[in-house]
Each structure stands twice: as C-alpha cells, then as structure tokens.
C-alpha cells in the first residue's frame, strides 16, 4: 500500500514539475544557415563602378534580384544558432541601366 502511495506521489510531483523544466538548453538544436555567406574580405572586393559580371564573379549569384527591373541585387545571409537569436546580413547592390554598380548598402555593416 505504501509503495503505491509513493509511486502515485512521485507521478504527481513529476507532472507538476514538468512545466518548470530547464531542459530547453539540453535539447539539441542545429545551427541553421541560409543564403549567401559573405566574409568582410568578400564585401571589400566590391567597388562602385564594377559591372554586373565582375560582381557576380567576386560574390557569386545573388540570393534575389529585384523583380521590378530596378537592377538591384540582394545578397542575404540568415543565421539561426541553436538557442540564440536570429541574425541577418543583407548586402544590397544597385546597378544603373548600363549594368554598372552605383550603390552598395551593407546592413548591418560587415567589416573586418
């Protein structure tokens, strides 16, 4: 009889403390990396006045291009470490009608 009471009490105690679990960090969550991974060295290779072909050679294919025909390329890298906040790096390159780079927007700034 006493064994059944202890077992029932242990089961109830276990159910009550299950909501207060600190196992969140124990459970493995893989790092998720998506997009164009660019280093500060890669970004430093790009200069205003380069052609689209030169930029594509230096950085690779952009993640996205502007669908409205404004000759804008987006290099986006999103990183979600297992139990940390998501970070995102966006490099936006704008070209003129001749395909020459006119503007570089690096947010947040990726520097050495």
Curated annotation (Swiss-Prot):
Name one process (GO BP) from the record: protein insertion into membrane
Query: Where would one find the signal peptide in this protein?
Result: 1-19
Pfam families, per the entry: BamE
Q: How does it sit in the membrane?
A: Lipid-anchor
Please provide the record's keywords in A-Z order: Cell outer membrane, Lipoprotein, Membrane, Palmitate, Signal
Query: What's the subunit arrangement here?
Result: Part of the Bam complex, which is composed of the outer membrane protein BamA, and four lipoproteins BamB, BamC, BamD and BamE.
Name this protein carries in UniProt:
Outer membrane protein assembly factor BamE
